[in-house]
């Protein structure tokens, strides 16, 4: 016979006291960077279409890219893309069995992914500016 036992567990509703492990943060940021990259594709395709439409369109696209805010947004897009690719490779390596699926290995690979992303982000900053 199955009993329907309701356990009285404490409920913590204060979100500021919840600490996610680094693996959860890496996974959440991977999803966020995927959404950013998806939205950025439309913007970048519009910019490409404008630049290829005519010599005036190319000049218009070049003028758009000269602004600091646009360069900052482009740097953010490149950083999101780099993060998404690096963590995507990490997930694939784990799925194919090349990385251990232990919590410690997950933490270590997430930290390595963050470091690689910071390096690529700095390179993207040099490229954009």
Curated annotation (Swiss-Prot):
Gene Ontology BP annotations: tricarboxylic acid cycle
Periplasmic compartment segments: 53-68
A Gene Ontology molecular function term of the record: metal ion binding
CDD domains xrefs: SQR_TypeC_SdhC (cd03499)
Residues that coordinate or bind heme: 84
Cofactor mode of binding and number, as noted: The heme is bound between the two transmembrane subunits.
InterPro entries recorded: SQR/QFR_C/D, Succ_DH_cyt_bsu_CS, Succ_DH_cytb556, SuccDH_FuR_B_TM-su
Pathway(s): Carbohydrate metabolism; tricarboxylic acid cycle
GO CC terms: plasma membrane
Cofactor(s) needed by this chain: heme
Keyword terms, alphabetized: Cell inner membrane, Cell membrane, Electron transport, Heme, Iron, Membrane, Metal-binding, Transmembrane, Transmembrane helix, Transport, Tricarboxylic acid cycle
Superkingdom, taxonomy of origin: Bacteria
Predominant location category: membrane
Intervals, Cytoplasmic compartment: 1-26, 90-108
Family: Belongs to the cytochrome b560 family.
Record PANTHER family: SUCCINATE DEHYDROGENASE CYTOCHROME B560 SUBUNIT, SUCCINATE DEHYDROGENASE CYTOCHROME B560 SUBUNIT, MITOCHONDRIAL
Subunit structure: Part of an enzyme complex containing four subunits: a flavoprotein, an iron-sulfur protein, plus two membrane-anchoring proteins, SdhC and SdhD. The complex can form homotrimers.
Name of the protein: Succinate dehydrogenase cytochrome b556 subunit
Source organism of the structure: Salmonella typhimurium (strain LT2 / SGSC1412 / ATCC 700720)
């Amino acid at each position: 016979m199955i009993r329907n036992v309701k356990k009285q567990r404490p409920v913590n509703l204060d979100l500021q006291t919840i600490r996610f492990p680094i693996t959860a943060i890496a996974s959440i940021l991977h999803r966020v960077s995927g959404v950013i990259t998806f939205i950025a594709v439309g913007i970048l395709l519009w910019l490409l279409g404008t630049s290829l439409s005519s010599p005036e369109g190319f000049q218009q696209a070049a003028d758009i890219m000269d602004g600091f805010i646009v360069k900052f947004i482009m740097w953010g897009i490149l950083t999101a893309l780099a993060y998404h690719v690096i963590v995507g490779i990490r997930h694939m390596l784990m799925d194919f069995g090349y990385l251990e699926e232990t919590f410690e290995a997950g933490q270590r690979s997430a930290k390595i992914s963050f470091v690689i992303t910071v390096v690529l982000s700095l390179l993207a900053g040099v490229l954009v500016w």
